[in-house]
Amino acid sequence: MIEGVYQERQDAEVALRSWIGARAGLFFLTAEAGSGKTNLLAEMMRQYTERGIDAIFLRGNRFNSNDLQEELISRLNLQKGLELDQLGFIEYTQENPLMILIDGANEHSASVMLFENILQFLEKHKGGHIKVVLSWRVNTKSELPIADEKYQSIVYAEKTEGVSEDNLIQRSCYWLKPLNKKEVESAWELYTGNQNKKDKIGRKPNFTYEQLTYHDRSLSDQLDNPLLMRLFVEMFHGKGLPKSRGGFISIWTLYHQKLISQ
């Protein structure tokens, strides 16, 4: 994340707003590394709060246990030994829920156990008055955690495009797509524009995104990943277009070469 910089993700934001009134309790968001999941959840936290919806932002790698209810009681300084409906949570409704955003649940030391606990928690608090937006980093759908089909009613599915062989999470998850062309152009302007004075890292190459596209299309095509975009503009701050090496140039390779040379 770059402080003060967020590239709008219209489709994903619409999906995360439109499910607010759903009866389902789990919105499973997934994508590859560097796709902008954390930035998106931080933006949705802002949007939910702006709409008057109580929201809590948690990071998977900072849980003190693999029990969501215990974590909520600890973070909110609630009385231990009581159920949530005894602590005022019953006041939330399907239309005006408590929204819990959990970023990077896969980074928890016992991620599968945490995921199962979240499902059990939502099964216990059915009705849509408590909702969880859960992000999980994977490279392919085969790496997603498996949920029993008995949880189908609590897992939100915007579309039912999955094939019959897909399990519940595979067919229900929202896959955060790479940046589209307009978003890439906008992100380039955001990343290379006026920077926060507290941010000491330069991100202004001596060429435009359009010039890069004409120079090396395969290189510019990799910038649909927000993390690769950031690494690229930092590596080429104050520099001209990268020299052609013939063939495909990987931004990850360039980045690793830079680290080795330091």
Outline where the language-model segments fall:
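Extended charged low-complexity segments that act as oligomerization/scaffolding linkers
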Residues: M1, L68-L78, L87-I100, A157-P178, ...
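Walker A/P-loop-proximal flanking segment of P-loop NTPase domains
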Residues: M1-L26, V112, F121
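Short loop/turn elements that form and flank the Walker-type P-loop nucleotide-binding site
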Residues: A22-R23, Q94-N96, K126-H129
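Post-nucleotide-binding-loop coupling segment downstream of the phosphate-binding loop, primarily
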Residues: T30-L98, A110
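Extended hydrophobic
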Residues: M44-R46, K141-L144, E149-Y151, E165-L168, ...
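Conserved nucleotide-binding/hydrolysis micro-motifs of P-loop NTPases
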Residues: R62-N64, N106, R137-S142, N180-V184
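Short secondary-structure boundary/capping segments
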Residues: E71-R75, F115-L119, L144-Y156, G238, ...
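Conserved Walker B catalytic segment
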Residues: I100-S135, I146-E149
